[in-house]
Regions:
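An acidic, low-aromatic, low-complexity terminal/linker signal
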Residues: 1-165
Length: 165
């Protein structure tokens, strides 16, 4: 006599609803949305370490023009990237209302200079749309996709591509 192994999911048993919930949870994404001028961008919330007010940075020689300098964050030297400049839109004229989003990209922490944080947005990953082929310009090189949230288009930043020179 042989016995076949059958999972609860195959039989429609009690674990089916739990498995469906796990799949749905895995297919959701959360992003911190923020603004640069009138444009909205998002960065994966799992990469965000903290958000802090703008403070002066120490400029370093021979850095890419979009690196504003470095700051000391609890003993860790963190380079600060001016996203406006990285996107080819000129230097950010910083004020005390600007913010720095500290993210981890690979093994390095990096600060992203932005105008303001807007919200935490959650959506199904299937709602992420590709960047249109007609999109030209520096900013589109650093985006992984677009998502519409509450009638607003949010451009999702691909962190690794920001740091490729």
């Amino acid at each position: 006599m042989s016995y076949a192994s059958v999972s609860a999911a195959e039989t429609g048993g009690p674990d089916t609803a739990y498995d469906d919930a796990k799949v749905k949870a895995a297919a959701r994404a959360q992003f911190i949305s923020f603004a640069i001028d009138d444009n909205q961008y998002g960065v994966d919330i799992m990469a965000v370490r903290e958000i802090k007010e703008w403070s002066n940075v120490t400029p370093l020689p021979n850095q890419p023009e979009y690196v504003r300098g470095v700051l000391n964050l609890r003993g860790v030297t963190v380079p600060i990237v001016d996203l406006r400049r990285r996107f080819g839109e000129g230097l950010t004229e910083t004020t005390p209302t600007h913010i720095v989003i500290i993210v981890r990209s690979g093994e390095q922490q990096v600060g992203l200079l932005a105008d303001r944080v807007l919200d935490i947005v959650a959506f199904e990953t299937e709602k992420i749309q590709p960047i249109p082929r007609t999109a030209q310009g520096a900013a589109s090189d650093f985006l992984s996709g677009l998502v519409t949230f509450d009638d607003t288009m949010i451009a999702l930043i691909d962190l690794p591509s920001l740091f490729v020179t």
